[in-house]
Amino acid sequence: MPGHEITQQLDVVYGSTVRSKHVGRDLLAGLKNIVGGELTAYTELLEESRQEAMQRMIAKAQQLGANAIVGIRFSTSNIAQGASELFVYGTAVIVQPNAPKLPDPFNP
């Protein structure tokens, strides 16, 4: 993290969510597949899943006393017919701002 120093590594933290596909979304996605274009229903579902998994990971990091998470990675997997897991993980750390190397001429 630019301008910060990691002072303590706490632990690996993660968050996940499992979502199932919606029959209506599948039908519309099938039509889009034929004519081409973005599958917006799935894009929205994936964005919701990312947000939920991230919030769960952040909550775990905060419970450890972390003020940052580094090395964040996302992974997806199919776990059952029509259901997928989105998994996010990273390392919970404590960071502190670096001391400026030169005096700031704008803040005497």
From Swiss-Prot:
<dbReference type="Pfam" id="PF01906">
    <property type="entry name" value="YbjQ_1"/>
</dbReference>
<dbReference type="InterPro" id="IPR002765">
    <property type="entry name" value="UPF0145_YbjQ-like"/>
</dbReference>
<dbReference type="InterPro" id="IPR035439">
    <property type="entry name" value="UPF0145_dom_sf"/>
</dbReference>
<comment type="similarity">
    <text>Belongs to the UPF0145 family.</text>
</comment>
<protein>
    <recommendedName>
        <fullName>UPF0145 protein ACIAD2946</fullName>
    </recommendedName>
</protein>
